[in-house]
Amino acid sequence: MAEVKYQADSSKIVITGITEKPIKIPSQMYPLTGDLNYISHENTEDFPDNPTTEKIKEIYNSITPGVGTCYSNIEKLVDALEKEGIKVQPMVGWVFLGGSLPVHHCFAVIENHILDFNPNFDSLYTEENANLGIDVLRDKLTDAMIELRKKPNSETTAFGKASKMALYIASPCKPQAGLKVYQKLMKAFPKHPCYRNIFEGTNETQRMFFKKQGMI
């Protein structure tokens, strides 16, 4: 497997070693809606211990996030936070997890704190798991997803500090505008490399997750 390399400046990032051709963000195939922002474990922080954080946590934990519905998840969160007078910025762009293909994604930030309902799988990124076959790893991943969803969002997702394995490349954007960007992208590139395993709007991991819970 080729080494994943990132070459970045203030206006673009080029990633090699994931796909045959370099991934360039922003570009026609990997668009952004505005200025490029890099968000990672290194430049995010845990929320401070104060009453405002407790209110943010209460609202964050009150949302039941759907799987594969990041745009509507963040729209609900932003609406709830803004009703309480809390300033929050929705973001739309691309997230890389552990050097894998990027996924178009919607999340939110409050200053240098991230809010992302994606489960935090840092504990699964081990040398042992790296050597597992994709089907075995997917089975292990979905079991972990089911267990994590039994706990408060703030304990199992990126609440404040980003995952060590995640790199976000995104721009400020309202969730529904981000969804339109995604839909336009899929129409222009129906065989987009990041969605080559998508079927009826879900990927194989998400389908296994739904099947284990009797939802399909």
Which sequence ranges carry the predicted segments?
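A structural boundary/capping signal
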Residues: 2-216
